[in-house]
């Protein structure tokens, strides 16, 4: 009976971590900060064309949000001295800044990602 309980707990742990990973993969993260003009432009663009997507805006000046940004920078091997906002994470891709090229990248990645609320 003890082994059955241990096995069930192991399976439950695996299932819960799989759920947590999939929910994280269903979000687009936009790291921004107050006063960032490019962040505002990115926000307005996403609100207009991608409002059905699960986009989470994260202000890097609040709480420990900067640590989350650093975690993604490390994951994508982005040097700290070249970080800026907006920094957008879409699945296994990231975008730094916001201009014509970044809009094209965002559109391409968003179509691949297809995460809706």
Label every PLM stretch briefly.
Residues 34-37, 60-65, 93-96, 101:
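Solvent-exposed loop/turn segments at secondary-structure junctions
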Residues 15-18:
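C-terminal motif of bacterial Sec signal peptides marking the signal peptidase cleavage site
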Residues 89-117:
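Non-catalytic, surface beta->alpha helical segment in thiol-disulfide oxidoreductase systems
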Residues 54-71:
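Thiol-based oxidoreductase modules, predominantly thioredoxin-like and allied folds used
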Residues 21-56:
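Local sequence-structure signature of Cys/Sec-based thiol-disulfide redox active-site neighborhoods
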Residues 1-7:
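Positively charged n-region of N-terminal signal peptides that target proteins for export
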Residues 70-91, 99:
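Structural micro-motif
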């Amino acid at each position: 009976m003890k082994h059955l309980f241990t096995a069930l707990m192991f399976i439950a742990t695996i299932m819960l971590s799989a759920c947590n990973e999939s929910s994280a993969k269903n979000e687009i993260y936009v790291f921004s900060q107050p006063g960032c003009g490019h962040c505002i432009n990115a926000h307005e663009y996403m609100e207009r064309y991608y409002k059905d997507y699960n986009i989470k805006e994260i202000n890097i000046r609040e709480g420990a949000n900067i640590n989350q940004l650093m975690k993604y920078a490390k994951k994508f091997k982005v040097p700290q001295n070249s970080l800026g906002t907006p920094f957008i994470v879409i699945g296994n891709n990231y975008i730094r800044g916001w201009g014509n090229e970044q809009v094209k990248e965002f559109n391409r990645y968003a179509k691949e990602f297809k995460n809706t609320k």
